[in-house]
């Protein structure tokens, strides 16, 4: 339940509006509310980090509003809480009125939800499940440059899960659609909340089965097999894509060195 911020309130401050995050001096604000001119604003505690509260403040600041990507180098737990704040702020902003009857909505006091004051419909934050998969072929890994990555970064394949589809089916479909190959021996690795804007990445490793690379030009600029010790520019540390690549490299080194 949200409340008015008082002078001595302290902690981490996730100040967000329209999927942007307030980052004075390029950092997530930490300290007393008065130091950031937040006294009198409404805040909702969305978690704790290292014993300190993490607050969500739905507010637009004139300066220093940036992307949550700018804090990806934070500790994983704090980055996830910052992402939670940005996603919740957008959820509350976009669910002021009921999609069924049009009446005004209000936030639940017990969970992350919005409730209709008229028809009692209940809405939850949207989460879009995605798959991401590292594909190994002997001593090489399949890496691709996506059309949305114009900075030369090469990464593993990924895509959204479709309605009525299992995660395993999504992997097989996305890999075939984007690269034209089939995979086998699929193994789940980990997951990562990814607030761009509201994804949940489910990460897998797989082995090459059959087929030749034929890219989907709408999705990829190129895709190639890269030997584990001769890789192109990779995604930054802290991303699940980077972890998948590093795990694959470690497996190759254990087998070929």
Swiss-Prot record:
Organism superkingdom: Bacteria
Residues in Nudix hydrolase domain copies: 125-248
Can you supply one Gene Ontology CC term for this chain's record? cytosol
Where, by residue number, is the motif Nudix box?
159-180
Record key words, sorted:
Hydrolase, Magnesium, Manganese, Metal-binding, NAD, Zinc
Indicate yes or no for the key word Magnesium: yes
According to the UniProt entry, its GO molecular function terms are: magnesium ion binding; manganese ion binding; NAD+ diphosphatase activity; NADH pyrophosphatase activity; RNA NAD-cap (NMN-forming) hydrolase activity; zinc ion binding
- Pfam families from the xrefs? NUDIX, Zn_ribbon_NUD
Annotated residues that bind a divalent metal cation 2 are located at 174
Q: Which family does it belong to?
A: Belongs to the Nudix hydrolase family. NudC subfamily.
Q: Which HAMAP family match?
A: Nudix_NudC
Name this polypeptide is given: NAD-capped RNA hydrolase NudC
Organism field = Escherichia coli O1:K1 / APEC
Q: Which gene encodes it?
A: nudC
